């Protein structure tokens, strides 16, 4: 006997037995009511494997389940009705949890990791037939999709990344879903109409206590108590986006089967905010995201492993972040920031991302590896300050490399399950100690570079001008080619409260950087450069005073094979340069508001006093950027190693200039060495005090300034005052010490020319405004 008909008959019989006639009094109380109400209860579902297969390759989700978040049974209620020609659906459900035990790719022994998501789903939909054409498709009006009370756990090698307090509300009005003819065939097209997306992230934290606290995994209501840092957060995010345009999805990837997503999105009058103690806020965020060829998603395999590829031949991102605030919302504003980024394939320079299971090979079998390639051409970034704009014009960048993402734990606090040990900070040597507690981003063979044509002030087609040299103090070069290896590991919680802490190692090699360069590529170049940088126990916070970056313990070595004047490759060499730095407690602070009103070329707190001193009073408005850099240089108290009489300690402040080398070989020429430089507070009662440091305070504005043209001894003022890139700077320190000044001969060794050099109580102010020469 076939069991299905028998089971169906039994179900019908049970429903018939449950039916009974209503008497007259009961019938009289029944009123007409349309619609359907469905109430369901379920113990959830599970699947041992869910696979997506493409061109014979598979992405597999192992041990997938969706169950009640509390208890054993989940419930939901759905109400369906038809009013005014629309199908109206209201849906609500009890909290649930979705779990995926492993995310794998066929052909790889590694894994992307596992995840769990606690969530509550709700919806109010108003649907009717007829898409944008009014003939076929679906129209969506006055509808809302909500995902609330979300806590997301991502597990990598036994450690957890936790996203808390997550909620999304999507509002759809005048939206359509159609099947249309696209450039590659039939496409499913979602026209967003008047859409709004409201999202909140309450916090992002890490749980680095390996595995589960008991046989039962941690939940939002019963967190893992073993990691004391698990309660700290990277900060909060809020967004309120008004969206328009369309999103199309078609079959077929870059080759063979796959998926092609074609965005044509508009963002208008939106808000984006990050919150720590202070805030980073864009009060009027707008822009577009478009790709004519679309983004393709493919599954593929090469000699390395299986991977999922996201690629795009073209992508244009245009955005304006208006009303930018850094720090306290009642403070001055920065102005607005606009970006115009154009990604486009150009021969071997392509745009793609290959995602592979497993992270850094020294961080376990789980995690994420991404091979990357990018090419961005003819782009720009602009800053508007009190209505005056400045463009970083002709921005170009391209490169390739590999990124890894892992959750790791150091053995510094004692050997525990899953920790990694090391004793070496040099990445080129064994036992590298670059494994720390936190979320680790690894950088491997990132070969790339960037350049931009120069500054334009006033309009996007204004003449190119200088001024980029003023940014070198913040190590922003006008042009830079490099090969980068290293890592940065992040922990939630800053120096206080929310924010982040970090440990990092970066090695730039085979690099070439411009200090100053003109439109022909001629200038002052750092050629054949190696830059080795290390950060320990640093932090980043957003306070009411702005963004505060603390470098913690920092040491670096910049070695320039040739300081060239002219062409980057063939210009005249001024010699070899080595700069070592060892700092403790250095900081960088960025805040809203520039110089405001100030006296240029004189002194005085108001216009009258300024004019009386021979100066010129300028009011640069309440917007702009202020930057404060403090470098605390630490004295090396013992020489651990030497070469030809010169100290070679890794953590030491030292400047070496070498000329007259034999065939350009380091160490074969004559050297001038400024050795063991350090700062001091210059306090006789506490000679070891060193907190004041070497300070550079910069106010950056886009503002008009007075310019005159030299005509045979007279200077004719330019009318009106032209706009320029204005920098008001102040350099100040209490004391700088240099242990010794050495002259070094390649065969005769080092001779100390001076001992115990001191420079005290310097306070130098300057005002520079760069305008076009023509």
Locate each region found by the language model:
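Sec-dependent signal peptide recognition
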Residues: 1-11
């Amino acid at each position: 006997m076939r069991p299905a008909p028998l089971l169906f008959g039994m179900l019908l019989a049970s429903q018939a037995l449950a039916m009974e006639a209503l008497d007259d009094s009961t019938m009289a109380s029944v009123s007409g009511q349309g619609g359907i109400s469905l109430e369901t209860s379920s113990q959830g579902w599970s699947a041992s494997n869910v696979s997506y297969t493409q061109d014979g390759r598979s992405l597999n989700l192992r041990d997938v389940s969706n169950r009640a978040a509390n208890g054993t049974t989940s419930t939901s209620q759905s109400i369906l009705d038809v009013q005014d020609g629309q199908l109206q659906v209201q849906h609500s459900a009890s909290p649930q949890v979705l779990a995926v035990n492993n995310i794998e790719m066929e052909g790889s022994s590694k894994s992307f990791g596992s995840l769990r998501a606690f969530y509550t789903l709700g919806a109010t939909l108003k649907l009717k037939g007829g898409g944008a054409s009014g003939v076929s498709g679906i129209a969506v009006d006055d509808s809302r999709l909500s995902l609330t009370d979300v806590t997301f756990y991502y597990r990598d090698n036994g450690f957890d990344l936790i996203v808390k307090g997550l909620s999304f509300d999507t509002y759809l009005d005048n939206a359509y879903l159609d099947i249309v003819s696209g450039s590659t065939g039939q496409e499913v097209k979602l026209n967003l109409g008047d859409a709004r997306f409201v999202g909140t992230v309450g916090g992002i934290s890490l749980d680095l206590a390996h595995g589960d606290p008991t046989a039962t995994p941690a939940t939002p209501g019963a967190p893992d108590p073993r990691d004391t840092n698990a309660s700290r957060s990277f900060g909060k995010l809020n967004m309120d986006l008004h969206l328009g345009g369309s999103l199309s999805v078609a079959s077929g990837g870059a080759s063979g089967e796959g998926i092609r997503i074609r965005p044509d999105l508009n963002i208008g009058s939106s808000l984006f905010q990050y919150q720590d103690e202070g805030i980073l806020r864009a009060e009027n965020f707008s822009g577009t995201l478009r790709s004519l060829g679309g983004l393709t998603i493919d599954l593929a395999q090469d000699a390395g492993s299986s991977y999922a590829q996201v690629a795009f031949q073209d992508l244009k991102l245009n955005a304006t972040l208006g009303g930018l605030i850094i720090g306290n919302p009642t403070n001055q504003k920065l102005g607005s920031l606009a970006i115009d980024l154009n990604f486009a394939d150009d021969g071997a320079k392509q745009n793609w991302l290959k995602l592979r299971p497993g992270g850094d090979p020294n961080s376990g079998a789980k995690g994420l590896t991404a091979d990357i390639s990018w090419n961005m051409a003819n782009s720009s970034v602009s800053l508007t300050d009190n209505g005056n704009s400045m463009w970083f014009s002709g921005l170009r960048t391209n490169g390739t490399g590999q990124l890894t993402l892992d959750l790791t734990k150091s053995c510094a606090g004692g050997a525990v399950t899953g920790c990694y040990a090391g004793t070496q900070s040099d990445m080129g040597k064994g036992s590298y100690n670059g494994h720390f507690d936190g979320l680790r981003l690894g950088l491997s063979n990132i070969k790339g570079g960037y350049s931009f044509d120069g500054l334009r002030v006033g309009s996007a087609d204004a003449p190119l001008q200088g001024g980029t040299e003023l940014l070198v103090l913040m190590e922003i070069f006008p042009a830079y080619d490099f090969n980068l290896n290293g890592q940065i590991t992040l922990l939630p919680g800053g120096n206080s409260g929310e924010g982040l802490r970090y440990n990092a190692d970066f090695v730039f090699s085979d690099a070439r950087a411009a200090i100053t360069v003109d439109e022909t590529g001629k200038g002052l170049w750092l050629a054949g450069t190696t830059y080795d940088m290390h950060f320990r126990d640093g932090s980043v916070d957003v306070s009411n005073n702005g963004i505060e970056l603390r470098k913690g313990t920092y040491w670096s070595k910049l070695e320039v094979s040739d300081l060239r004047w002219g062409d980057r490759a063939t210009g005249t060499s001024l010699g070899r340069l080595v700069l070592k730095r060892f700092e403790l407690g250095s900081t960088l602070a960025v805040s809203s508001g520039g110089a405001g009103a100030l006296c240029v070329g004189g002194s005085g707190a108001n216009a009258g006093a300024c004019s009386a001193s021979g100066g010129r009073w300028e009011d640069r408005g309440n917007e702009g950027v202020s930057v404060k850099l403090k470098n605390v240089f630490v004295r090396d108290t013992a020489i651990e190693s030497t070469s030809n009489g010169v100290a070679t300690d890794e953590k030491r402040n030292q400047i070496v200039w070498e000329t007259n080398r034999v065939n350009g070989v380091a160490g074969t020429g004559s050297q001038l060495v400024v050795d063991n430089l350090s700062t001091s507070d210059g306090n006789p009662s506490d000679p070891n005090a060193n907190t004041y440091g070497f300070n550079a305070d910069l106010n950056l504005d886009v503002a008009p300034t007075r310019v005159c043209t030299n005509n045979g001894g007279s200077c004719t003022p330019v009318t009106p005052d032209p706009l320029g890139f204005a920098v008001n700077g102040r350099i100040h320190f209490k004391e700088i010490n240099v242990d010794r000044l050495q002259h070094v001969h390649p065969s005769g060794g080092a001779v100390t020319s001076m001992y115990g050099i001191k420079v005290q109580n310097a306070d130098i102010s300057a005002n520079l405004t760069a305008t076009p020469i023509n």
